[in-house]
Amino acid sequence: MKKITLSLSLLALSAILIQCTPAQPETQEAVAETVVEEQAEDSRILPSWNDGRHRDRILDFVARVTDTSSVEYVAPDQRFAVFDNDGTLWSEQPIYFQLYFALDRAELLGIEHPEVALEGGYGPLLDLFALTHTAMTAREFDGIVTAWLDTAKHPETNKHFTDMVYQPMLELLDYLRANEFETWIVSGGGIDFMRPWTQKVYGIPPQQVIGSSVQTIFENTGDGPAIRRLGKVDFVDDKEGKPVGIQRHIGRIPILAVGNSDGDLQMLQYTASNELTNMQVYIHHTDSVREWAYDKDSHIGEFHKGYEYALDNDWIIVDMEKDWATIYPE
C-alpha cells in the first residue's frame, strides 16, 4: 500500500513539474516573433526618417510622455507641440515663399520694381507687404492666397509651393496627433497667409496657427459684416515674439518645439522651461542636392546662436542629409 501511495505521489509530482516547466524552444520562438513584430511596427513609424539616434530619441520621448505608468507621463490636455513653418515644415529658399506671393501681387497691382524691397531692409519690406497684403477684407485676402497657391510655382524647382513641404515632418505631425498631441504652427510668417491652407496641407486647423499680423477693424459693408485689413503691423511673431504669441493663443507652455533658425531659439528655450518632460528639435539644412544647405551665414534661416545653444543643451539637431530618406512628398 505504501509503495502504491509513493508511486502515485511521484506521478503527481512529475505531472506538476511538467506543467510548470516552460517550453524553452517555444518561448524563445515567441520572443523572437515578438521582437520581429515590434521592429516591423517601429519601421512603419516615421518611415521617411532614417534609423538613428535622432529618430530613436523622438520615439522614446513620445513613449515616455504617453505611458500612464511612467513618472514622465503628460496628460493629453498638456501635450502641446509647436512648429515653425518656414524652413521647418516647408522650404524657405532662396526667399521666403510669402515674399514670392508679395512680388506676384505687386506685379498684378502694377507696382514697379517691387524686387528692390528685397535689398532695402526691413522698412521697404513692410511697405511692400502693406501694398500687397492690406486694403481688403480678411475674406478677400483668404481667397487671393488660395488662388495664388493653386497656380504659383517655385522658380527653381517648378513645384507648387505646397508640394515643397517636408515629408518627414508630415509624418511627425501625424505621429504626434496619433498620440494625442495638439500640433500648432508658430511662425514669423503672416498668420492670415498661412491659415487658408494649413488644414489641407498639414492637418493643422486655422485656429492653431500663430503668426505675424496686421491691424484689423470690423465694419459693415454692402456684403455684410467684415474684417478689414489695415496697413499697419499689429504683431511680429519672431524671436522673442514667439513665446509671447504662444502665451496669447495657447496659454500653456508646450512640451515639444521644432524650429530651424535663430529666430526659433526663444520658442525652444520657452519650451525647455516647462516643468513637464519636454523636447527641443532643430532642423539643420545640410542637403545641397535635394534641397539647400545653409546655416550661420545664410540671409534666410540663419542658424548660428541656436546651433551653439542646442549643442550645449543636448537638443536634437536633425541633419537633413543624413536623417531624412526623403525630402518632399512623392
Question: Which stretches of residues belong to each language-model region?
Answer:
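Positively charged n-region of N-terminal signal peptides that target proteins for export
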Residues: 1-4
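Sec-dependent N-terminal signal peptides
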Residues: 6-13
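C-terminal motif of bacterial Sec signal peptides marking the signal peptidase cleavage site
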Residues: 16-19
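C-terminal cap/substrate-recognition subdomain and adjoining C-terminal extension
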Residues: 24-45, 49, 56-59, 63, ...
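A short, compositionally biased domain-edge/stem linker segment
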Residues: 64-70
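Short loop/turn motifs at secondary-structure junctions and domain boundaries
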Residues: 71-75
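Asp-based phosphoryl-transfer active-site loop
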Residues: 76-94, 268
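A metal-dependent, Asp-based hydrolase signature
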Residues: 94-95, 100-163, 167, 171
